[in-house]
């Protein structure tokens, strides 16, 4: 079936490598940027319930969004569930440095959702959420705990982009 397509678009270079490793002809595969930049953000009014009580709403200090996923970790596979706290050291050090140096708040956020398959279809937090949640737990044991917030909701793409639009800066590995 794969060979019958005249064009296959690909977002992650590793996907091409995986296809090639399994013997697929990738001559019709074209690597492209993630199309998320084309999504329209939700309005400030629409995101209000999702940012209530967060540093984004309070605006006491600049707020930096921080998105982390398995692809950003030093050792894969990206979909592991057994991350050790030691594997987050460089991110912890980076966030501590940013908070100290620039007197900002950090909002940790997952960038993707998952779902339970039909017939019981239900959106759920994606595989990236436990990663940012673990980073949050680690940071809660540091002197900057009060400057770190975990965005723990389940957000659709429009709401996600609306939230991101309200960060003063976004740091993302994706």
What do these predicted ranges mean?
Residues 1-174:
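Active-site anion-handling motifs in enzyme catalytic cores
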């Amino acid at each position: 079936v794969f060979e019958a397509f005249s064009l296959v678009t690909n977002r992650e270079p590793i996907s091409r490598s995986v296809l090639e490793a399994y013997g697929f002809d990738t001559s019709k595969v074209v690597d492209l940027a993630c199309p998320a930049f084309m999504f329209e953000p939700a309005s400030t009014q629409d995101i209000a319930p999702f940012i209530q009580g967060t540093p984004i709403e309070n605006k006491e200090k600049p707020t930096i969004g921080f998105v982390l996923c398995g692809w950003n970790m030093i050792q894969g596979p990206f979909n592991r569930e057994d991350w050790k706290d030691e594997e987050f050291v460089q991110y912890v050090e980076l966030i501590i440095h940013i908070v100290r140096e620039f007197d900002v708040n950090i909002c940790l956020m997952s960038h993707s959702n998952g779902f339970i398959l039909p017939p019981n279809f239900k959106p759920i937090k994606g595989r990236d959420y436990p990663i940012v949640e673990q980073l949050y737990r680690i940071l809660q044991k540091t002197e900057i705990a009060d400057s770190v917030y975990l965005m723990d909701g389940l957000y659709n793409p429009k709401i996600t982009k609306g939230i991101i639009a309200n960060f003063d800066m976004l740091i993302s590995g994706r």
